[in-house]
């Protein structure tokens, strides 16, 4: 049924018309921003206190990627943001920290979706891996002036039923290439003008980025399939960050989906 819903709600061919157009130099300028670095330095101690999630132990986004997300969200200042794949809340917390900084005409909104109940179930991942706080508890302790909605649903059904649109979408859900493809296509339908899509676990060519395991093919294959169907997208892998990520490297699996022309 959910697959039928997905196809029924697609009213037209996917288009990159609403995506922002960026170059790698634009992204590097953001990641090397002195102003955002000052904001990061001001909030990083509190984030480390709340987000006591050891890298490599929970499957959560690594510390360097969390910082990169903070920088990207601060730079693009989305009023409405979507995250697919809450998991233990590492990325969620850093997104909220970025959203809460700055002057807003309206309260910014984050919708974060996961197929599991990430907060209250006895089987929630944060409990299973021995963390002290749920994603909801972590973000509540920030006292952020941000509207946050946790949704327990699979991404296909969420996209098929949501009436919302978003300025910035972070995709870190099911990495099977079919689901990742559908997530990208569905994101294109709900992205606002000059919007941005960010992928996690994007391994160019499906090749390993680190020595601790094989590369993941799903997000890369999905993004290539979108382009192969004629959608004018461009993927910008962030490659190496100005700060450490994991295993003593600066390498990241984050990548941006932008308009190619």
Task: Annotate each PLM feature.
Residues 55-56, 60, 66-261:
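S-adenosylmethionine/decaboxylated-SAM
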Residues 1-46, 260:
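Membrane-proximal basic amphipathic "stem/tether" segments
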């Amino acid at each position: 049924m959910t697959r039928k819903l997905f196809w029924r709600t697609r009213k037209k061919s996917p288009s990159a018309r609403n995506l922002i157009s960026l170059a790698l130099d634009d992204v590097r300028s953001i990641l090397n921003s002195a102003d955002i670095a000052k904001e990061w330095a001001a909030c990083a101690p509190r984030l480390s206190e709340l987000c006591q999630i050891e890298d490599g132990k929970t499957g959560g986004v690594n510390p360097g990627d969390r910082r990169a997300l903070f920088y990207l969200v601060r730079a693009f200042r989305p009023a409405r943001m979507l995250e697919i794949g809450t998991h233990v809340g590492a990325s969620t917390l850093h997104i909220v920290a970025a959203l809460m900084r700055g002057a807003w005409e309206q309260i910014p909104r984050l919708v974060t979706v996961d197929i599991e109940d990430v907060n209250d179930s006895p089987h929630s991942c944060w409990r299973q891996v021995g963390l002290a706080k749920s994603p909801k508890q972590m973000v509540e302790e920030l006292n952020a002036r941000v509207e946050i909605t946790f949704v327990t649903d699979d991404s296909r059904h969420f996209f098929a039923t949501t009436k919302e649109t978003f300025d910035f979408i972070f995709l870190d859900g099911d990495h099977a290439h079919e689901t990742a493809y559908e997530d990208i296509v569905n994101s294109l339908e709900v992205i606002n003008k000059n919007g941005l899509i960010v992928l996690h676990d994007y391994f160019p060519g499906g090749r390993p980025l680190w020595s601790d395991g094989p590369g993941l093919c799903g997000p890369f294959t999905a993004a290539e399939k979108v382009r192969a169907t004629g959608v004018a997208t461009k993927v910008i892998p962030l490659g190496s960050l100005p700060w450490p990520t994991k295993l003593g490297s600066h390498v990241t699996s984050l990548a941006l989906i932008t308009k190619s022309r």
